[in-house]
């Protein structure tokens, strides 16, 4: 039954790094939260709490930012993907500045934080957003579509018109530690030609070969190369998982995305939430509910037996 109950981290754990776009030092702490609290970002320097939900998205340029009452937290997608991928339903994400530390540019350091903290099972059943009808956003050759499915899967096709990133695809079905094995280590990336442009806009001030894959006209500049042959598409899957985590609960459905980004992902979340016919929220209130839901979402009983 534990795998169908909500989960939080068992103790406080912290890490320190720099913000990718702000370049400012940042300390992040994952802290336990009670059942039904969801994920909440806390600007410790301002004393402002920002629920990790789509309604609080304030910017989607190059990353996803949340805001409330004049306070913002930028680049939330990697830590959100890690919490979702590790099955965490409730958590306080405390940060002492305006941006989440980028660390190595992937979600792996955040999954390690969850592993270091351990997991505590809470006395309340999980809630799932079940997709009942397809919903999609299109913009030219870009697509983001969420459709009914068993479990939660993401399929992404990336095409940047670059010799190394042309028609690159990756698909994953979450559950059975698939996020840790196949997605978490994929790093963010950028093109060398865009760096000066981004910095002129006040962005990418903390970027380096230590926290991003940098690509020039023909090659990867990072001396260690890629972690996966299709690392670019895998990272776009990571971003999409983090963006869809702003539903505020696990999704039962399949995301099919082609060249989408943070703005399109959040537009899709908003469109699904605005259509009562397209989705429903199901809560597991006891062991009796689990078999019926398990038939629909066999992949969502993740990390069974690993929680305290």
Swiss-Prot record:
Listed GO MF terms: metal ion binding; UDP-3-O-acyl-N-acetylglucosamine deacetylase activity
Residues the entry annotates as binding Zn(2+): 78, 235, 239
Gene Ontology biological process terms in this record: lipid A biosynthetic process
EC nos: 3.5.1.108
This protein's UniProt keywords: Hydrolase, Lipid A biosynthesis, Lipid biosynthesis, Lipid metabolism, Metal-binding, Zinc
Cofactor: Zn(2+)
Pathway where it operates: Glycolipid biosynthesis; lipid IV(A) biosynthesis; lipid IV(A) from (3R)-3-hydroxytetradecanoyl-[acyl-carrier-protein] and UDP-N-acetyl-alpha-D-glucosamine: step 2/6
Reactions it catalyzes: a UDP-3-O-[(3R)-3-hydroxyacyl]-N-acetyl-alpha-D-glucosamine + H2O = a UDP-3-O-[(3R)-3-hydroxyacyl]-alpha-D-glucosamine + acetate
Annotated Pfam families: LpxC (PF03331)
GO cellular component, one term: membrane
The keyword Metal-binding belongs to this UniProt entry's keyword annotation: yes
Entry annotation: catalytic residues: 262 (proton donor)
Family of the protein in this entry: Belongs to the LpxC family.
HAMAP family, sorted: LpxC (MF_00388)
Purpose of the protein: Catalyzes the hydrolysis of UDP-3-O-myristoyl-N-acetylglucosamine to form UDP-3-O-myristoylglucosamine and acetate, the committed step in lipid A biosynthesis.
Protein name, UniProt field: UDP-3-O-acyl-N-acetylglucosamine deacetylase
Organism expressing this protein natively: Anaeromyxobacter dehalogenans (strain 2CP-C)
Gene coding for it: lpxC
């Amino acid at each position: 039954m534990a795998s169908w109950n909500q989960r939080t981290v068992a103790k406080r754990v912290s890490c320190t790094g720099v913000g990718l776009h702000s370049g400012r030092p940042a300390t992040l702490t994952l802290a336990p939260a009670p059942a039904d609290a969801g994920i909440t970002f806390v600007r410790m320097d301002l004393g402002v709490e920002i629920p990790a939900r789509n309604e609080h998205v304030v910017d989607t340029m190059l990353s996803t930012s949340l805001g409330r009452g004049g306070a913002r937290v930028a680049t939330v997608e990697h830590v959100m993907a890690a919490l979702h991928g590790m099955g965490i339903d409730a958590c306080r994400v405390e940060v002492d500045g305006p941006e989440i530390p980028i660390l190595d540019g992937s979600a792996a350091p955040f999954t390690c934080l969850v592993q270091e903290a351990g997991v505590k099972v809470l006395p309340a059943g999980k809630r799932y957003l079940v997709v009942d009808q397809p919903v999609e956003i299109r913009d030219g050759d870009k697509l983001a579509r969420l459709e009914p499915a068993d479990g939660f899967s993401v399929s992404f096709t990336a095409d940047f018109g670059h010799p190394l990133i042309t028609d690159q695809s990756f698909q994953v079905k979450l559950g059975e530690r698939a996020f840790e094995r196949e997605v978490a280590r994929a790093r963010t990336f950028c093109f060398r030609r865009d760096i000066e442009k981004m910095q002129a806009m006040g962005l990418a001030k903390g970027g380096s070969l230590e926290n991003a894959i940098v690509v020039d006209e023909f090659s990867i500049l990072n001396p260690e190369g890629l972690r996966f042959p299709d690392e670019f598409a895998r990272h776009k899957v990571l971003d999409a998982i983090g963006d869809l985590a702003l539903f505020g609960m696990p999704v039962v459905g399949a995301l099919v995305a082609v060249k989408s980004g943070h703005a399109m992902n959040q537009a899709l979340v908003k469109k699904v939430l605005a259509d009562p016919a397209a989705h429903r929220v199901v809560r597991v209130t006891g062991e009796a509910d689990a078999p019926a839901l398990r038939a629909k979402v066999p992949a969502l009983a993740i990390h069974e037996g690993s929680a305290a």
